[in-house]
């Protein structure tokens, strides 16, 4: 975009202006009948250029501009109104493709330039241009370079201009009290390109500030360069509500200061409804995207609710079904008939006693008398089957059993839990009762046959006794533990101290060992202190003697 130096002469500005007007004139010659409109536009542009040159200040940091004198107001207003009327009548300028975003124009923040050097379409069309008089590339350089206009007239709406060389990660407007530093294009971006001709243009001079520093309190207080077109501060022509700001771009994050500023500065009754139209890129820059968390109901939260609902529906359906009583049998028919007589004869009021009396009388009846009631019961069943063909006794009894299960299930669960806890937490020495009081904890057989046979004092078995089978008579409740005793004896014989244990047992006990059984207790099977505990228990235990019954070889 051609720029003017602060000290540039009128001749240089005139030459540039004439060249650009010539280009625009060639482009506008394609549509006939626009000569008068072209002349009016040229007059307005030249007057604007003269104003900007006359009112430019010498300071580089000046960002405000005073409105033009009162004498030129009427003249410029007439020019612009006439130009606007002719543009609308001739339909020379088309409406913007994105009509719903009047406050901030969002360009494609990344990738302004195509590989061939031309400007991308998204960068060309990022501004709304209902009336592109002030936004055309030919006149952009003719504005005051020291105090560039922050806003263009887009359908008479003040729009903050986004500079071409803003960094992609820079937010659209920085709300701070500090001024922007003089901007230079970053290294990864090529110089600015004229969107009409494709010719690279010199960037903004380093001594010029292409931005307006906007603070939360300063928006709406900066004097507009075209003050004769903008209404006063208290009466904005077009207002922008927060909803209109956010609606076309829901991913834009607007902080609290911005929302309060917009809602307080502008009234929401004059803004046209925004259209649902996205930018050409369709994807906002990640630097200005606010994270949106979608809350989706999980399946785990839904399934229990559905399960309970289905159960409730089934229960309601069951309750809606009428309760059908089963047909009465012969005894019930007799009770129904004779109950009133028994109640009248007896002074008893308890139903159990009355039922007992009726039962005795029923059994005292003869077969012929009972046959009458059996016949009545058969007819009752036939009538019931005709009235309720699909009924079965399981319908009633199933409900009762179901109710009982529901009532008993928590009790049974607690009962089984307490049982398991008792078994788990019993100590090892108290897991079995004492042998004197417990019948099932004791065997009438020696603990280890090897211990009895290995003792020198024990009588040697003869050949006939060895050949004959040995029958051990045990108590009935102890037979189940016989195999366990043999396995325990085998383990005891395999232990390294079995020989010493057998000798120790045989010396004090001697031959009476066969007449005294050794009980199989948990203390004997315990790994620690196996044999001393058994020796301590031997004198205390008195049980029935072991009877050895031998069979003859015949």
Swiss-Prot record:
Region called Interaction with CTNNB1-A, residue ranges: 1-61
Ranges where the record places region Disordered: 1-73, 183-213, 391-475
Protein function: Participates in the Wnt signaling pathway. Binds to DNA and acts as a repressor in the absence of ctnnb1-A and possibly ctnnb1-B, and as an activator in the presence of these proteins. Required early in development for the establishment of the dorsal body axis in response to maternal Wnt signaling. Also required during development of the CNS for the establishment of dorsal-ventral patterning in the prospective diencephalon.
Protein known as: Transcription factor 7-like 1-A
Protein encoded by which gene: tcf7l1-a
Composition skew (Low complexity), residue ranges: 445-464
Record field: compositional bias (Gly residues): 1-11
Localization per record: Cytoplasm; Nucleus
Annotated Gene3D superfamilies: High mobility group box domain, TCF3-CBD (Catenin binding domain)
Provenance organism: Xenopus laevis (African clawed frog)
Predominant place of localization: cytoplasm
């Amino acid at each position: 975009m051609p720029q003017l130096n602060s000290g540039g002469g009128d001749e240089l500005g005139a030459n540039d202006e004439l060249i650009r007007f010539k280009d625009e004139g060639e482009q506008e010659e394609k549509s006939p009948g626009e000569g008068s409109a072209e002349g009016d536009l040229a007059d307005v542009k030249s007057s604007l250029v003269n104003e900007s040159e006359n009112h430019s200040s010498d300071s580089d940091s000046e960002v405000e501009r005073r409105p033009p004198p009162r004498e030129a107001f009427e003249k410029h207003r007439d020019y612009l109104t006439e130009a606007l009327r002719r543009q609308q009548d001739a339909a020379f300028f088309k409406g913007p493709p994105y009509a719903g975003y009047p406050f901030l124009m969002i360009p494609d923040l990344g990738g302004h330039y195509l590989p061939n050097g031309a400007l991308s379409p998204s960068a060309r069309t990022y501004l709304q241009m209902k009336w592109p008089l002030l936004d055309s590339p030919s006149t952009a350089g003719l504005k005051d370079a020291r105090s560039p206009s922050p806003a263009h007239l887009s359908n008479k709406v003040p729009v903050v201009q986004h500079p071409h060389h803003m960094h992609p990660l820079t937010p659209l407007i920085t709300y701070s009290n500090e001024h922007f530093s003089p901007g230079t294009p970053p290294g990864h971006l090529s110089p600015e390109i004229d969107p009409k001709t494709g010719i690279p243009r010199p960037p903004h001079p380093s001594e010029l500030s292409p931005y307006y520093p906007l603070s939360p309190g300063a928006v709406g207080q900066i004097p507009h360069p075209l003050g004769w077109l903008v209404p006063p501060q208290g009466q904005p022509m077009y207002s922008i509500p927060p909803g209109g700001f956010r609606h076309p771009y829901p991913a834009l994050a607007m902080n609290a200061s911005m929302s309060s500023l917009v809602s307080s500065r502008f009234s929401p009754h004059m803004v046209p409804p925004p259209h649902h139209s996205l930018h050409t890129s369709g994807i906002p820059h990640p630097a200005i995207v606010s994270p949106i968390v979608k809350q989706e109901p999980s399946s785990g939260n839904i399934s229990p609710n559905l399960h309970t609902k289905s159960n409730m529906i089934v229960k309601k359906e069951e309750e809606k079904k009428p309760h059908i009583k089963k047909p009465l049998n012969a005894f019930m028919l007799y009770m129904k008939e004779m109950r009133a007589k028994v109640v009248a004869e007896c002074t008893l009021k308890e139903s159990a006693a009355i039922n007992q009396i009726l039962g005795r009388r029923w059994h005292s009846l003869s077969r012929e008398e009972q046959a009458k009631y059996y016949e009545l019961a058969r007819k009752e069943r036939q009538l019931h089957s005709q009235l309720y063909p699909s009924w079965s006794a399981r319908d009633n009894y199933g409900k009762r059993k179901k109710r009982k299960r529901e009532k008993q299930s928590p009790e049974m669960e607690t009962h089984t839990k307490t049982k398991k806890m008792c078994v788990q937490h019993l100590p090892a020495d108290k897991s079995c009762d004492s042998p004197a009081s417990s019948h099932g904890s004791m065997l009438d057989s020696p603990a280890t046959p090897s211990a009895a046979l290995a003792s020198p004092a024990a009588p040697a078995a003869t050949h006939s006794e060895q050949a004959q089978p040995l029958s051990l008579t045990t108590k009935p409740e102890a037979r189940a533990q016989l195999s366990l005793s043999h396995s325990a004896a085998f383990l005891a014989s395999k232990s390294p101290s079995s020989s010493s244990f057998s000798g120790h047992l045989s010396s004090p006990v001697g031959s009476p060992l066969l007449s005294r059984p050794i009980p199989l207790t948990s203390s004997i099977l315990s790994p620690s202190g196996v044999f001393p505990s058994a020796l301590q228990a031997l004198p205390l235990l008195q049980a029935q003697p072991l009877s050895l019954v031998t069979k003859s070889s015949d």
